[in-house]
Amino acid sequence: MSSSFTPAPDTELPRLDRKMRILLVEDHAPTRMAISRLMRQAGAEVLTARDGEEGLGYLLTQRFDVLLTDLRMPKMDGFELLQHCQTLPESHRPKRVIAISGEYEAGALSGQPVQFLAKPFNLDVLLDMLGGKPN
C-alpha cells in the first residue's frame, strides 16, 4: 500500500512557526511513521498512536496543541475519538483537531470543531493548516 501523502516538492522543508506538541493517531504504520518523521523535521514534538483507543489514553494523561487523527481505524475509530475529546476536561483538550481520511468527506464532521484534510495530501497543505511557513 502506498503512502497517503506526498512530501512537499521543495528541497527545503517548511518549518512550523513554533514548537507544537502533536498527537498523531493513524493505524497505517508507513503513513504514521512518514508523517511523524516529517512533522519532527518541521520542528514539532510528535507522539504517535495506532488507534483511537491508544490515542485517548495519551489525551487523558498528556496535553497536546494538535490532535491529527485518521477517521477509519480498528478498535476505536476517529469519530469515536472525537466524541471522547468533547468530554475531556478543558485542560486536556487539544487546541486544534485535524481529521484526515481518504474515505470520508468533510461533511461527515459537520457540527464539530474539526478541520478536515483529505488523503492523499501534500505536506505543505498540512503545514499550512498548522501555521507553518518556509524557512
PLM segments and residue spans:
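Active-site residues of response regulator receiver
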Residues: D70
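Receiver (REC) domain active-site loop signature in two-component systems and cognate sites
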Residues: M73
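Acidic catalytic/metal-coordinating carboxylates
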Residues: D51-E54, D77-Q83
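Non-catalytic signal-transmission and effector/linker regions of two-component phosphorelay proteins
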Residues: M1-R21, Q115, N122-N135
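Acidic, metal-coordinating helix/loop segments flanking the phosphotransfer/catalytic sites
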Residues: T48-V66
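Hydrophobic/aromatic residues positioned on beta-strands within the core alpha/beta folds
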Residues: I100-S101
